[in-house]
From Swiss-Prot:
Region (Disordered): 22-50, 292-374, 420-452, 486-641
Residue ranges with Low complexity bias: 347-362, 571-588, 623-641
Record's function text: Transactivates the HES3 promoter independently of NOTCH proteins. HES3 is a non-canonical NOTCH target gene which lacks binding sites for RBPJ. Required for testosterone production.
Biased composition (Polar residues): 296-309, 363-374, 441-452, 495-526, 547-564
Example GO biological process: regulation of transcription by RNA polymerase II
InterPro entries: MAMLD1
Biased composition (Pro residues): 312-340
Protein keywords: Activator, Nucleus, Transcription, Transcription regulation
Localization per record: Nucleus
Protein name, UniProt field: Mastermind-like domain-containing protein 1
Family statement: Belongs to the mastermind family.
Cellular component terms (Gene Ontology): centrosome; Golgi apparatus; nuclear body
Biased composition (Basic residues): 592-622
Originating gene: Mamld1
Length: 803
């Protein structure tokens, strides 16, 4: 511990040495003063990684790396790469330089930072490769530690919290990088500080090349290629060194998976297995890949490390995820091999120490959640990374996109709830990651999301439940996955049962969260996700596309409902009522039209009816309010509501047909028939309302008998869009809608009075005593027809039959 602290101090000093290469390093180091302190503790963690005695702390550095990368947010991967690169550079000087300089560059210019990194930081990056090599030595213990460390969650949570609070992840990353890089690097790379610097120069070249490739793709490629060279951890380079390595593939799969939703569980479970592979054999390759990844990440960071989390090099990561990029990296790859030992360190750093040792794995899960980790996980957590990088798709399935994990409190964060929550918060701030969570994004990025099959099964289960994930992601991801699967089934059932109501129920909570995130994030996520989705995600895109349509459908339904809701004063409480309301509103309008005819026929009864109706409407309003509350409660009971909606939606058709037959006769002679048919309809409505009440009676409101079909009609009418009630029947609309007509007939007057009073906006309506066209106007149009129809129905039901 003390030794490492001294090393940290030395590393802190080293950045000054590196300052020759990069002046910003000192400033960065100063910025990271506290970060370094933290990293010193983390250094202990790394020591723990090396020694196996500080697993948690190791994780912390990983988290720092991951979260720091997240902090920049733009390029979690880039940041991670930066961090990793510098740490790898820990050739004591260049590493710090690379880290600090790159961090500064990242902070200053996410896009330029890569270029700067290429030059000033480029060498640091190159060194990071060396540093990776240096880290490599510890990388094995690091991974192993990660595997063995259950404290990862706590550490990750702490780190995430700190990261959330700290927006200078670059400085933290630099410190961590220095710590990580210096610790492994010092053993491996310290002897080579300048040599890494030389390679760093190469790395800068490679980095520019990667940059040219589109840092993400190149990064992925380089990682992949290095992976080919050093299959194990190159993915770390690509994705945090998780993905690409072939030998690392197990690690990648496991790491990715672990980094993914199961970062913790899988990391602990799989990483143990995969970590060993990452160990020495992969380290070399991983370090090489790491060097490439560091340079790549540098470019990725450059792209917008802070800006677009989803924009992150996730695309780059994604490419790494695809081995295809692997050939791409060949140019950078050669330098990485020189640094392969350090590269591995960078890889570990990169991938949050690759799979990042379980410790970093969790952080890596965060990183993964962030693009970088996603990249790192790309190989291992291909699903997780794609989910994350594609995050867009992921966003649909919170499953594993950084966005998803973030939005959904990170499925991955579900895996590590604390991280997930923190990252959720972080990614939440970064809409980019969140959008992947969005189902909408899922369709486009979602493809990549599920393109990562390893956890695709999980992702698929999560994808449908992404909305629920947003709600439940706070829970353990495994539990979430199970629950989400169940919920997904339920949602699917509900969706099938009632696509309209389903958005209500499933989206009520997720809707706000997932809908907002989906909408807001989906816009941002498509940007980053698309790159990810390119070749990586497309293979599995067909998988995601299916879930995404559902989510998008639900989303569209949500948007439709939301669009309708603002029309419906009380429709919002119950979306299902709104759906029913539209159909019921039509029936109500028809009834209203019939009632108008009947009303004209029985105009002499209208006075009494109106009074009674007025009385009823007061009672009815109360009932409606109760019903509204009840409906709100009903929404909480989606199953009943959906079932009820189905019945209502089905019944309204019959009711409409009945009403249509009723509306046909306009002659007074047929008035009785209208009355009878309408009465039967009213009874049917009442019965339906009773059913509704029985379904929702658990919350108990006015007894169904007390609640007349009029009440239900008013409620439904309110719920339904105003245009529906007015537009369905021109006659009733004329009677209700045209003031010239309304004042013309006592029916109009009564209707106006009833309407104004029956509407929930009765406060605006004129007194019962008289009818005020203006007051009537004040009442929402939809409410007027529906409430009028409801009031009349109440009248007719109770008094309409009296001669």
């Amino acid at each position: 511990m003390d030794d490492w602290k001294s090393r940290l101090v030395i590393e802190n000093m080293l950045p000054h040495f590196n300052m020759v290469g990069n002046r910003q390093e000192t400033r960065k180091l100063q910025e990271s003063g506290t970060s370094k302190r933290r990293q010193e503790g983390e250094n202990f963690h790394f020591t723990g990684m090396a020694d196996g005695s500080y697993p948690n702390k190791i994780k912390r550095p990983c988290l720092e790396d991951v979260t720091l990368s997240m902090g920049p947010g733009a390029h979690p991967t880039s940041l991670s790469t930066e961090m990793q690169m510098p740490t790898l550079n820990m050739n004591p000087t260049s590493a710090d330089l690379g880290v600090a300089g790159q961090s500064l560059l990242l902070e200053n210019n996410p896009l330029d930072s890569n270029v700067v990194n290429s030059s000033a930081m480029g060498s640091p990056f190159g060194v990071p490769s060396t540093a990776d090599t240096g880290l490599k030595g510890h990388a094995v213990p690091y991974y192993e530690k990660n595997n063995s460390m259950p404290a990862v969650d706590q550490e990750l949570q702490d780190l995430l919290e700190e990261l959330t609070k700290i927006q200078e992840p670059s400085s933290n990353d630099l410190d961590l990088e220095k710590i990580l890089g210096s610790k492994p690097e010092e053993p491996l790379v310290l002897h080579n500080p300048q040599a890494p610097l030389g390679p760093p120069a190469k790395l800068p070249v490679q980095m520019p090349h990667m940059e040219s490739l589109g840092s993400s793709k190149e990064f992925a490629s380089s990682c992949s290629q290095v992976a080919g060279t050093s299959l194990p951890i190159m993915p770390s380079s690509t994705g945090m060194s998780y993905s690409i390595p072939s030998s690392s593939k197990q690690i990648v799969s496991s790491s990715s998976s672990t980094a993914q939703a199961q970062v913790k569980n899988q990391v602990q479970n799989m990483l143990p297995v995969t970590m060993p592979p990452l160990s020495v054999p992969q380290w070399h390759h991983a370090h090489q890949l790491k060097a490439l990844a560091a340079s790549k990440q540098g470019s990725a960071t450059k792209q917008g490390s802070n800006r677009n989390w989803s924009s992150l090099p996730p695309p780059g990561l994604s490419p790494p995820y695809l081995p295809v990029p692997s050939p791409h990296p060949p140019p950078p790859q050669p330098p990485p091999p020189p640094f392969s030992p350090q590269n591995f360190t960078a890889s570990c750093m990169s991938s949050s120490s690759l799979s990042g040792s379980a410790v970093q794995s969790s952080p890596n899960a965060l990183l993964s959640s962030m693009a970088p980790s996603s990249n790192a996980s790309l190989g291992p957590t291909l699903p997780y990374v794609p989910a994350k990088l594609p995050g867009l798709p992921l966003n649909q399935q919170p499953q594993f996109s950084p966005q998803s994990s973030i939005l959904a409190n990170l499925v991955s964060s579900s895996v590590k709830s604390p991280q997930g929550h923190l990252i959720s918060a972080l990614p939440t701030s970064t809409p980019g990651p969140s959008p992947p969570y969005r189902p909408e994004n899922l369709s486009s990025p979602g493809l990549p999301q599920q393109s990562f099959t390893p956890q695709y099964s999980l992702i698929r289960s999560l994808t449908p439940t992404s909305n629920l994930l947003s709600q439940q992601q706070q829970q353990q991801q495994q539990q979430q996955q199970q629950q989400q699967q169940q919920q997904q089934q339920q949602q699917q059932q509900q969706h099938q049962a009632n696509s309209i109501f389903k958005p209500m129920t499933s989206s009520q909570q997720p809707k706000t969260l997932s809908m907002i995130m989906q909408q807001g994030l989906s816009s941002s996520s498509p940007e980053a996700p698309e790159p990810f989705t390119f070749s990586n995600t497309k293979p599995l895109s067909h998988f995601v596309s299916e879930p995404s349509p559902q989510k998008m459908a639900s989303m569209s339904t949500h948007s439709r409902q939301s669009s309708l809701l603002h029309y419906l004063p009380q429709a919002t409480p119950a979306h299902a009522p709104s759906a029913t309301a539209s159909s019921t509103a039509t029936a109500t309008l028809q009834l209203q039209h019939h009632h108008q005819q009947h009303h004209h026929q029985q105009h002499h009864h209208q006075q009494q009816h109106h009074q009674q109706q007025h009385h009823q409407q007061h009672h009815h309003q109360q009932q409606q309010h109760q019903q509204q509350q009840h409906q709100q409660q009903q929404q909480q009971q989606p199953d009943q509501s959906s079932f009820l909606l189905q019945q209502i939606m089905q019944q309204p058709q019959r009711f409409q047909r009945m009403m249509a037959s009723d509306s046909m006769p306009a002659l007074p002679g047929q008035g009785c028939c209208h009355r009878c048919a309408w009465t039967s309809t009213a009874l049917w409505l009442e019965h339906q309302h009773q059913q509704w009440n029985s379904l929702t009676s658990t919350h108990g409101h006015v007894p169904p008998s007390n609640l007349t079909h009029v009440d239900k009609a008013c409620k439904l009418g309110e719920a339904r869009p105003p245009h529906v009630s007015l537009g369905r029947q021109p006659p009733s609309r004329q009677a209700l809608g045209s003031e010239s007509f309304l004042p013309g007939s006592s029916f109009a007057h009564e209707l106006a009075r009833v309407t104004s009073t029956s509407s929930y906006n009765t406060s605006e309506a004129a007194p019962w005593g008289g009818w005020d066209p203006k007051a009537w106007r004040q009442v929402p149009a939809p409410l007027l027809p529906s409430c009028d129809a409801a009031a009349r129905e109440a009248e007719i039901r109770s008094y309409g039959n009296d001669p």
